[in-house]
């Protein structure tokens, strides 16, 4: 899911207002509705980060990969639920109902799934366990980086993360001092 944002870009030694295409990420809570000893139960499995748009495919793949299902026909229904939240008005919860031929012992399949992100969202078991607070910070002074330092920083980063040019899948950020030295 992509959105256009108005941004200020630095090009050819000057700033210009332009549109930029941004991919968004949102947390997704995956819950399971299943039978155990002929009783229907609901259980929250995991939270992961995703780019909204193909949530049902993501969930099917997750359940298959984790061997919760062995066949797509074991899923009776997948539905989004909960409030539409955030700037993009998105439902961030999915309930998967397994068909009644699948009798599950959740204790055998529930574990701490390995989904990680540096922001701390992935790996939580429910959205209720995740408290997101947004604190806006106002700068009290003008930026202290010169145009030259800003324009040199992408090439400095590229030189220090060689795997990105090979794979396109590993990227990083950098922290620079005000004189343009890459700190980390």
What do the predicted segments below correspond to?
Residues 1-173, 178, 183-184:
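Intrinsically disordered, low-complexity regions enriched in acidic/Ser/Thr/Pro/Gln residues
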């Amino acid at each position: 899911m992509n959105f256009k944002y108005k941004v200020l870009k630095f090009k050819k030694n000057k700033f210009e207002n332009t549109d930029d295409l941004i991919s968004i990420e949102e947390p997704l809570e995956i819950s399971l509705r299943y039978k155990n000893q002929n009783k229907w139960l609901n259980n929250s499995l995991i939270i992961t980060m995703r780019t909204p748009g193909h949530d049902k495919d993501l969930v099917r793949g997750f359940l298959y990969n984790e061997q919760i299902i062995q066949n797509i026909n074991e899923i009776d229904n997948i539905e989004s639920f909960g409030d539409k939240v955030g700037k993009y008005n998105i439902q961030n919860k999915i309930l998967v109902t397994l068909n009644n031929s699948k009798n599950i012992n959740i204790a055998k399949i529930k574990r701490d799934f390995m989904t990680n992100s540096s922001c701390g969202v992935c790996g939580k078991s429910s959205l209720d366990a995740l408290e997101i607070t947004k604190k806006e910070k106002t700068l009290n002074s003008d930026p202290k980086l010169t145009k030259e330092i800003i324009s040199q920083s992408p090439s400095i980063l590229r030189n220090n993360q060689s795997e990105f040019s090979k794979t396109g899948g590993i990227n990083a950020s950098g922290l620079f001092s005000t004189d343009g030295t890459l700190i980390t």
